[in-house]
Amino acid sequence: MKKVFFKTFGCRTNISDTGVMMQNLKDFELTANESEADIIVVNSCTVTNGADTGVRSYVNSASKLGAKVIIAGCGAFSKGEELFAKNKVFGVFGHSEKEHINTLLKSEERFVQMGDLTSLDDTIVSDYAGKTKAFIKIQEGCDFRCNYCIIPFVRGDARSQDESKIIEQIEKLALNGYGEFVLTGTNIGSYGKDKGTSLGKLVQKIGALKGVRRVRLGSIEPVQIDESFREILAEPWLERHLHIALQHTSQKMLAIMKRRNHVKRDLELFQELSSKGFALGTDFITGHPGESEAIWDEAYASLEQFPLTHIHAFTYSKRDGTPSATMSEQVKGDVAKQRLKMIESLVEHKNIAFRQAHHLPLEVLIEEGKEGLYSGYDQYYNKVTIQTSRDILKEWVRVDDYDIRMEANYAKF
């Protein structure tokens, strides 16, 4: 039986997609060692140039191992055919084809099978190999058309998974011992708009299921937080961390980016959620075309007011085919990187201030560790490192006594 190795790049949605592919692999053996694989499936990301570079570099190194290299994921749409034409990969397939992976990998002929951008998966994933938490894809695609973003062109328009299928998958995973569920998708806040329901209503039902200990949400847009979502904020099973995508804190830049959020309303929302004890994360792009010194100064001064604890910040990456790619007022790379460092430093200090102000008992799911040193994430999505002689891998641990350090909270018992 031929052995298959999966290499997953990018977001939590890709982790979920890899789970779907593994679940449908019936006539092959999975391996965790790429050097012994007959076939290497690269579930790729294309959100930035850096992501493309990482995938391309891995494909080059993987091809030297003698295995057939197959590219899937978002990069299949942006770079797949180019890699195929250069004989860098044996095959390419799109999102809608991943449930046919068992047949595709049997092909003796090189192939490109892109499929469509309208389908949803039917597979119920019952296990995530090597993972302590389960990733539940509740929707696919995005109806937003932000000027810098290529993702709608490689994931399609927003479409919601059937609620019954989501519930069934979580129930099966809970029976298999999973207690933390991470809801993923391209734009999860759009869940239900095509089905007459909402994200808040779905999450309320998930939280009521037997075995669900913690629900973590992927990124949400500020405009998607409605009353049904506010109704779940006090629920004990909801992670006390929310990731709300701002992308920028200058109103002028938001207009240039064609974003739907508004700085003043965003700040009010963040202050409301912070007052309820939530840790708050966001995305931020520095160096987007048009980000003048005046706009940057305005944005930084505004960002200082936000009660943030986490940030996923990155410099602007030109994506061919997007409106931003043709904008003339480019920002120098070194300037964008310096601005990136500024906001990362700002939020790093905000994070430790939050932890000092919320020195409360922590509930930690231990995700990795060995030889007496373990780590996991608490209900605020902060890393906790634990030194102990006990084997606590994959356990839920309550931590009352701990030190607050810049890089993580630290406990010993």
Named regions from a protein language model:
Residues 45, 149-156, 214-223, 250-259, ...:
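Conserved strand-turn element in the central/C-terminal portion of the radical SAM core barrel
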Residues 1-190, 227-231, 242, 263-272, ...:
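Proteins enriched for Cys/Gly/acidic motifs involved in redox and nucleic-acid/cofactor modification
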Residues 46-51, 178-205, 209, 220-228, ...:
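Conserved glycine-rich "GG(E/T)P / GGGxP" loop and the immediately following alpha-helix
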Residues 175, 200-209, 214, 225-284:
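Radical SAM/AdoMet-radical enzyme domain recognition
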Residues 195-207, 227-241, 291-309, 333-338, ...:
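Short, electropositive alpha-helical surface patch
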Residues 75-76, 222-225, 390:
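Short beta->alpha connector loops
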Residues 326-413:
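Terminal RNA-binding accessory module
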Residues 41, 74, 101, 183, ...:
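Residue-level signal for inorganic ion chemistry
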